[in-house]
């Protein structure tokens, strides 16, 4: 089996992210899925869980360190499935920006700084005419 790429994913525990992880694991060439989460999760084959504080001021740097290690083992892509569901209507604009721009932006910067050139963003922000973004 020729396993020649890895994926580092943020937001892989939600409904959309879980589907992305399942699809990645169905690809024989995917050597590893590295899930960045806020809490430890149950071990799975070909899935590595790395717990990081997404609110930490150095989250981008922590991500860059992790992404560099993943990328050093061969080709890698980054995926963000971070998003907010219908409950987000209760969130302030500042809270939404902190998540969608702050956390996702820091993750993207960290992956880019590590040399990962492919970044996939799955987001519903701005997906409707009523979007606050």
Predicted stretch roles:
Residues 10, 36, 81-82, 119-125:
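SDR active-site strand-loop-helix element
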Residues 35-42:
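Short, polar loop motifs at secondary-structure junctions
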Residues 10, 14, 97-101, 131-133:
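Short-chain dehydrogenase/reductase
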């Amino acid at each position: 089996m020729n396993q020649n790429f890895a994926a580092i994913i943020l937001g892989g525990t939600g409904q959309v992210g879980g589907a992305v992880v399942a699809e990645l694991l169905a690809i024989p060439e995917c050597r590893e899925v590295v899930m960045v989460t806020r809490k430890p999760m149950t071990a799975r084959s070909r899935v590595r869980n790395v717990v990081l504080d997404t609110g930490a001021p150095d989250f981008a740097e922590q991500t860059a360190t992790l992404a560099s290690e993943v990328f050093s083992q061969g080709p890698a892509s980054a995926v963000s499935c971070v998003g907010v569901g219908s409950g987000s209507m209760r969130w302030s604009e500042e809270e939404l920006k902190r998540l969608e721009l702050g956390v996702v932006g820091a993750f993207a910067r960290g992956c880019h700084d590590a040399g990962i050139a492919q970044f996939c963003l799955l987001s519903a922000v701005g997906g409707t005419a009523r979007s606050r973004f």
